[in-house]
């Protein structure tokens, strides 16, 4: 998974070969021509590398040789021409979980979709938000048969169009059943009357002992009028919090 494990520590404790003394001497073992730039952290497991690119591709390569096991377009799974993924896939119980987003203005919404890792064949997809600006930029995590993933938005970019009526998107965090795609729960990230609160970064951290999922949010768009008015009167004072 993107953060290495459930704690999202991003530490490879078993890596002993690469260090400050030899990193400058490293040379490519193999290369692979993608359909676009790659910004997602690759998933490396079972001798294979899984990753998406900004050209709309999703790939599985042999980690040692770079040989292509399979390479698909994200649009094959979603049915939407401009679909891309910027999230690190996660593999659990023989199922590959990937989040996606549209590239074009006014395109379709977010969804999580699941290819089978051996062939890349489609299994199921789930749409977590009907808002047209919704995307998924957070990489999912799977624990105990449940996918944890949040929603983000392109609405602040859409607002560059002066004709666009911003803002109405409300972010949420969801728990989805891995085998079926059934949404177990979904929680909004901002109180009623607010908009924004996108979950756009990294991967959730899961604490199995406490039964808690840790996430970060950002990009608040709007606040209720009474809160905004209070803020103007009492700028930076606790009275408005």
Where are these regions (language model features)?
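Repeat-blade elements of multi-bladed beta-propeller folds
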Residues: 1-6, 35-57, 80-112, 132-165, ...
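Short loop/turn segments that connect beta-strands within beta-propeller blades
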Residues: 23-24, 62-65, 116-119, 177-180
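Surface-exposed loop and turn segments in beta-propeller and other repeat-based domains
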Residues: 73-80, 126-131, 183-197
